[in-house]
Every structure is written in structure tokens, then in C-alpha cells.
Amino acid sequence: MKKQLKVIIYVDILFAVLLLFFWFSLPKPLFITPTSYVLEASNGELLSASIAKDGQWRFPLADSVPEKFKHCIITFEDKRFYNHLGVDFIAVVRAIRQNMQAKSVASGASTLSMQVIRLSRKKQRTIFQKLAEMWMAVRFEVSYSKEEILTLYAANAPFGSNVVGLEAASWRYYGRPAENLSWGEMATLAVLPNSPSLVRPGKNASRLIIKRNNLLDKLVEEKIIDRATAQLSKAEPIPSAPLPLPQNAPHLLNRFKDEMKALKVNTTRITSTIDENLQKELNRLTAQYHQKFAANGINNLAALVINIKNGSVVAYVGNCYLPQQKEMESHVDMISARRSPGSTLKPLLYASMLNDGFILPQTLISDVPTQIGGYSPQNFDLGYDGAIPADRALSRSLNIPAVKMLQQYKYERFYDKLKKFNFSTLNKPADHYGLSLILGGSEVTMWDLSNAYLGMARTLNHYNDYQGKYNNADYGSAYYVKDQEKPEEVIEPTSLLDHGTIWSTFNAMEEVMRPGDEGLWQQFSSSQRIAWKTGTSFGFRDAWSVGLTPNYVVCVWVGNADGEGRPGLTGIEAAAPFMFDVFRLLPSSKWFEMPKTKLKRIAVCKQSGYKASPICETKLVQWVPPVGEKTALCPYHKLIHLDAAETYQVTNQCYSVTQMKHKSWFVLPPTMEYYYKTKNAEYRILPLFMEGCQQEQTAVMEMIYPKANASIYIPLEIDGNRGKAVFNVAHRNNNATIHWHIDEEYVGTTKNFHQIALSPKPGKHTLTLTDQNGERLVQVFTVLDKEK
């Protein structure tokens, strides 16, 4: 009895060991081979793919297998597939009998389950390996459904050359997805894994046709297809050689490779948010412009289109893709490249100053020759307006007003604001950039720049959705993975910029004259309203244009990836036409809704754009952000006293108060006035004081160059002698005579036009100017010595 009990225990132990061995004999995961990176459009169509790390075209596991392939592969390889548990013993007995009769391997008995095991193990086949495959195939069938087994087979079967898996084979041999293949095409693919090294497209074509036709006949016998379908399928040609896979978004595919971990995606295949038709049209447009630009040595351009409504990327062209021309550097993704932004940050400064109560939309900004700590910004046209409304300075992209505005706003504050806009490339302290920050002194990426404008547009679009409040998630990054998890809504009473500020900024950005339209585009009812801004970096290295409607943000860049500058490479000439052609590919939309509860009607001085003071002559009522109430009153209107004929200024010391006429007068500082009056014919210069009247202490002269306490350098001429610097002063009286002195030494006299060429020695000097009325201007400047 005890002996029998021991036997039972030993048998149970043996059975348990065998059961454990059986259970753990199947490796997990079954396949650890690398797969190709695959990028699909939002409709599931293939956009781009790259070869796997082991040099094979092997797509990730698909969700299902096309019905045609199921019928073909089961009929050809394993007709009792649905009736066995991994091993087809009927086929085994048949194979043994046939092989014994032929005295060689004339027939096999591998089921599809066994073939999947063999593909996963990749070991040399022996009788023992065959038995192991049978064992593991049974174990395989225990854990996997028949559909899962077919899916694994279809994804890992060899199809000749370096093509692995049905999806890769379908694209390589037929240029389209497997579900779109005909019976003849699917039968051709189904027979390839049987002997992929001997029979494949481009090799042994006649044998491949025979095998395909035999399979089609079997499908007729099994009543899967009819005879007519089989005959038509036999007439189809077989592919002659592998085809290149689509490369409609190669740069986005590479971006996905780099960001795969951050995106928390566990497969190398993603369905993107890209609109397939728009992407192809944008590729065509990019190639068209590349052909045009290449004649001028401009090799690279990129375009990004984002759907504002949901924040999804609908088109992504990182460069004009020309892999066969390596000198073009078309592999560089310019959407993620760090480049100088030129003037494209100016709207963000304009919006920040509106939002924080520094200016109103049309506040006059100084536009005169400027020196700030040795830094001398220049307008692109090298001219000066004297003073210009802030919104017009933005639309004309003037550099000096932008620097003046940043000087007022403080570059440290603007730097912090850009950080909140999520510009990832500002990795140095604010002092490193200084005032050049507004003129392209930093680096940005197209991605970050587009996301900044996307956040503003989304915020304004959501004005009604959140009852005037703000969702901080609006400033989150755009996304390109279709099912990517969206950030949670965080509703706050305030945001980076308020609705009224954004609306005012977009209106200012809309007023730019479009290239080729000569300012008349607004007269056409079909014209799309677009807020847009161009940018050109120093040395003509980068041309930018970014634009938006309530539905889309479009950002384009034109230039050379290696940073070489080219004549004519400007935002308005190169990038803007490209951007507007991109907008023509997109549906039109209405303009942004006016956020009336976030705007306030206040009286504004027509001439200065400041909040109107009581003595402003002409007032306008404008919609401005409520914080505009905090801005300063107009500083340029002054109450002056005139004689009865309104010819001269007078004082009570020389003229009867009862006969005086008191008038409000628009008066700019001398330097601003000097340039402003040449561009504005309606500007009236202050009348002179009547003879014998004591003048009030108002500035009548102002130095244009050099500014007070400026350090200047006077270069040496070719002959080795020191050259001359042109000193320039503005005087309110056009007929004034000015006497010039340097260090109390007389150097010359000017009348009407007050410029003089001087060559002071290196060192510190005192400049003294005196006009015919005894008015004096004294200031200090320093001439630098190059040798020191």
C-alpha cells in the first residue's frame, strides 16, 4: 500500500514538473525582433516608414489580418488550421509516408502554429528541433487564439529579400495596404513564405506564377472564389522588384522616433493627426517653391499647419525631402531646428505691453536714431518716422520702435513672459540677450513659435466656452499622435494674455500689406482675413512668416540649413508668399469674435494714441483692454499762449493776457519732431516767441548723434588717418543758426541743416551748442581708441 502511494506521489510530481515545463516552455514575448517605424495619416493611410534596426522591413503587429490572406494562407499551408491544436497528426502521418517512399524530404507537416514557433526561435532544423516545435506549438495554442496566431504569422513570415511580414510585403511589392489587394495579389504573397529565398518578385518569376496559379485553383476547389475570379487573377502580372515605401512625412517620422519615450508610446507604429491630402498638397507646394528658391542658392524650407480648434498638427513638412541630393541637407528637420526668429516675436511684445498697461494699440512710439549702451538698432529700410503708432510699427515691423518698447517694458520681464510661452531654447540668462531679444538675438524653433500663437488663438476662441475665464491648457503644446492623452482643463480667472489684448494684437497683425496685393486685398469679399507676421534674421539667413485664422496656425521658414545667408532671403519676399499659398489650401473661416466684456471704450487722443488728456484737440473712442485705463495721459499736447493773430507765442510779461489766445498744440520732442514732420505734412511746428518775450524753459534743441554719454568709435581711413563722424542735432526753428564747440573750442556753425563732420581725438569730450537766441545744449561723449 505504501509502495503504491509512493508511486502515485512520484507520478504526481512528474506530472507537475511536466506541466510546469509545458507551461513555461513558451518564451514571452514570443518575438523580440526590432520593427520598422511606421507613421500613418489620420485616416490610417501610410505616410512614411523606416527600415528596422536589423535592416529588415518589418512592420509592427497589426490589429487583424485581411480575410483574403487568411483564406489563401490556410488553403496553401494548413487547411485543417481551425481543427487541430498546433500539430496536424494527419499531415504528419502523410508526410512520413511520402518521405519514406521518396527516400528524401518530399513533404512537410508544419502547421501555421509550428511555423510561428520556428520563426520566433530561428534555430537550425533537426529532428529534435522539429519535435520541440511540435511541443511548443501545442503550448502556443493553449495561450493564443487562432486569430492571434494568424496575426503573429502574418507579421513575421519572410517574404523574400529583407521583407518580413504581410504589411511590409504589400507595400514593398504592390505599393498599397494589404486590405486593398486583389485575390491574385494576395495569392502571390501567400506562397512566398514557403520558400522566400528561392521564389520572390524579381527572382524565378515563372515558378512564382505556377505556385500562385496552383493556389488559385485550390481556392476554387474549396469554393472560396469562383472560376472566373481565378482566371482573372491568373492574368494579373506579378511584381518585378520591390517598390520604395511612401515618404510623405519623413521628418515627422524621425520626430516620433526621438520622442517615442516621452510620448509613452509602446509601439513603433502610430496613427497621426496628419491630414493625408493636405500633407501631399503641402509636399507638392514645398517642392514647387524649392525649385524656385534653388536658383538663388536657397535650399531648404519647411511648413507647419496646426488645427487651432483641437491643437492637432494637420500637416508637417520639416524640409523639402531630397535624399538623393545630400548637399541639400534635406534630412534636417527645420521645424525642430534652432534658428534666429527675426521679428516674429514682436507681436508677443506688443501684446505683453497692452496686457500689462504700458501702451494702447496706437500709442506713439519713438522712431529716431538710437544708441543704447553702444547698441544701435536700425530699421530694415534705414529710415526714421520720428514717431509712429505702436500697431503700425508692428505691421511695418520697425526695429527701433520695437527696441524702444522693450526698453520701456524691460527685457527681463519679456524674457520671463517668453519662458511662460514655453520657448524651450532660451537657455541663457536674460542679460545674455538684452534688448537684441526682440530683433532675433535669441534662437527659437518653428514648433515653439507656432505653439505660442496657437495658445493665443485657442484662448481667444474659448472666450465664450469658459464664460470669460481661461484654460491654462490652451498654451500646451500641439500634438500629432491621434489618440494622445489631452491635458486636463485648468480654468483660471487670469492667463498669460487676456482676451481683449489678444483680439487687439491679431487686429494689428492683420493690417500688414500682403505681397503682390498692393494693399487692396481687403476689397475682395473672398479674401481670407489672416493675422500674420514676417521675420528676417541678421545676414539674410532665415526668412519667416507665421499667420493664423480662428481655425489654423501656419508657420513657414525658408533658408539654408547650414546658415548661409542669401540676397533676397527675407520674410516678406520669400516666406510670406509661401505661407499665403498654404492658406489657400485650407478652408476659409470667419474672423475672431470680439470679446466685448474684455474690452472697454475709452477716449484716445487721435494724434498721439495715448489716453486723451483734457486739452487733446481731437479725441476718438476706441475699444481697448480695460487695463488701458492705467496708461498715462497724452504727454504731447501742451497749452500754449498766442498773440491775437496767432503768429507768435507770448507771455504775460510782454503781451496783454486779455488779448491772448490759448490753444492746445501737439508738440513732439525736437528729435522726434525732426523726422516726424517730414512724414506727416499736417504736423505744425510751434510758433516762435514774439520779440521781447521771455521764452519758457522748453527744449528747443536735441542731439540726434551722438546721444548723451555715448561711446563712439571713429575708424581709420585707408591712408591711416582718423576719419570723421557726422554729428547731428535737431532744432525746433528751421531757420536757426547753431554754433558748435568741443571742449570750449569753436569747431563750426550750421544753419537750417544741422549736421557737421568732426574728428575728435580719443577720450572724453564736452559738446556745447548755442543758437542765435542764446539757447544752449551741453552733453558729454567719449571717443574710443581702437589701440586700447
Segments the model singles out, each with a brief description of its role:
Residues Q101-R125, E179, P242-D258, I359-F414, ...:
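Conserved catalytic neighborhood of penicillin-recognizing serine enzymes
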Residues S272-F293, V305-N307, Y316, Q324-A337, ...:
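A penicillin-recognizing enzyme superfamily signal
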Residues G44, I73, V116, I149, ...:
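Residue-level preference for non-acidic, small/hydrophobic
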